Amino acid sequence: MKAIESILADAASIAAMRRDIHAHPELCFEEQRTSDLIAKALAEWGIAVHRGLGKTGVVGIVKNGSSTRAVGLRADIDALPMTEHNRFAHASTYPGKMHACGHDGHTAMLLAAAKHLARHRRFDGTVYLVFQPAEEGGGGAREMIRDGLFDKFPMEAIFGAHNWPGMAVGQFAVKSGPCFASSNEFKITVTGRGSHAALPHNGIDPVPVACQMVQAFQTIVTRNKRPIDAAVISVTMIHAGEATNVVPDDCVIEGTVRTFTLDVLDLIERRMKEVAEHTSAAFGAQCAFEFHRNYPPTINHEAETAFFRRVAAEVAGVDNVLEFEPTMGAEDFSYILLDKPGCYFLIGNGDGGHRAGGHGLGPCMLHNPSYDFNDDLIPLGATMWVRLAEAWLAK
């Protein structure tokens, strides 16, 4: 894949911005410094700037010609609450905070594209550059929408992307339909009656009740839904008791549920509640069932996915546009795709041929304390953004 020459010429300066962002990571809705950097750069390049959506979100507006057509390009900007292990010059300077998912690179790619689009304006219409906060659990996309993102900036479609370690630089991957799962959490408090461990018959032990629930939950996946409908119920925490010779009053179970469709999610939530309540009753215990729906599934729209495939094949070559298998990870671009047609795609962050977090042992996976974004990707990702915008708003 060949990057646009003017973007290549700016690659070093944009990479320096990326490393500055990496060194100063900010968590959900705290991205004030990052937003200031983005807004300042956009303004210097003659791009109109709107701030405040989703607290720390930034929207750049690039117009050309007379068309009322518009398209959106989105990058997330927040970091993770992690301690970085890297020791290079641009490692995090904020203890307990790190850009371990590459949002610094996503921001840099969209900034590079913004600079080129503002300089050359080879399109007819409006490009909205959406720099979104709080993707990592904060639902920043939802908050920007609630604050009027699509009312203030009416766009026909919107595209989002994520770097993908292990996939070669210059390769892209996409899938029509469900591609990322919904993310949901549950908490079940089983209440029995405490007793001496030597006299369990005098109490109601909540621990075996909880154990029965954990096993029964897996039969929801294997026996209550269709085998072709993917779902995962993961019990990740069980807490009970404070002393070895005491049967506790309570046992708390917590975990996550992930599905690709809301119908399956509805089924699982209903059946988990039934299993929890009926199992507790069978043992003479009581339970409090809590289920929190976080991110919905990310479902790419067919027409926009086909459009991306066509443009990506022209830019990167058909052999470098891959189909990726759905993942049970979650992404809050899902909220955007509930409101607007669009497509979310992956960009190869390298298969071992880059710095790889400084250890030189191959690419680090996302959310790894030795991860680093591959700067070689910046001009390629920016080129893809530019070509998507120009193709959507072709003169």
Specify the residue positions occupied by each region the protein language model found.
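Metal-dependent amide/peptide-bond hydrolase catalytic core
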Residues: C211-K395
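Hydrophobic face of alpha-helices
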Residues: I14-A15, C28, S35-A39, L110, ...
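Acidic/His- and Gly-rich active-site-bordering loop/insert found
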Residues: M1-H99, D104, A108-L111, K115-F123
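Non-cysteine beta-strand/loop elements that form the S-adenosyl-L-methionine
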Residues: R74, T83, F186, F345-N349
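A structural signal for isolated positions on well-ordered beta-strands in alpha/beta enzyme cores
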Residues: H50, Y128-V130, A288
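Histidine/acidic-residue-rich, glycine-tolerant segments that coordinate divalent metal ions
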Residues: V58-V59, L80-M82, N86-M98, D104-G105, ...
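Divalent metal-coordination and catalytic microenvironments
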Residues: I21, G60, L73, H103, ...
